[in-house]
């Protein structure tokens, strides 16, 4: 290589390296600037959140909440905001799917008469553009007469604070289920098993899905029960007993009954499990402030894209680590999402 060629080649390499450094530097500066902006916004959000849950005056709490909503909406509109954790916001629920397809942010606020208002946002990936879209959730619980049969959206949301996000795969499709809590009012609480999916080529959320085996019209489960009741709705490995029947055979000295029961078998399955509810007073069907657990536990397990019900005796024999099976009871939820006395 002659001197001219060497000099030309060296200049070309230096120009390329300079271009990469400038490009990387500008990207890094943009990333750093974005991060610092998000940190500043998080500090403002944290201050507003503390006011939302510490002020004794209802109007001050809800005014802080409106400012919180506006500030959070601005923060979520920032580039790369999906990947910012908001760790300081420990009084609201933030659940992110393992596949990074979406995250859902929910919280509730109690007014002076003991009723709860629910708020939330969904950030979800538009697979067509690879961009994350943000949707504010509007609680329309009071306007949903057939709540277990309706598909809902961001503008017609059955408000809840979600504490568990369940993901299962079948036939190259991911199915998502949310478990949620609604403080409702001074008489009753609510829990919900809520499927969530997204419109094709969009990040727009769809709440409710026909994924419950042999329950085609059911879009979700909603449980309402007395504020005095301890209700369980969780997802974990559980043990259950089954008794099987076998056709018996005649013997020389014994005529068999049509069927004979085999001894109990104890099996285990990862499932959503919940208490069956019943009114404490006869004739109070539909008056949910009187509903308490009946003592029966029902399970749902995922198979071939559907949630199937286990009707056998589910045993309280969960040996899993508590860290892997955290499901807050109502008292724990009250500590996470504070209520006013």
Regions found by a protein language model. Name each.
Residues 1-44:
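Bacterial Sec-dependent N-terminal signal peptides
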Residues 101-108, 174-182, 270-276:
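Short beta-strand elements that form the blades of beta-propeller/WD-repeat-like
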Residues 118-127, 192-200, 292-304:
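Beta-propeller blade signature
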Residues 148-157, 161-170, 184, 205-302:
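Short aromatic loop motif centered on NTY/YTY
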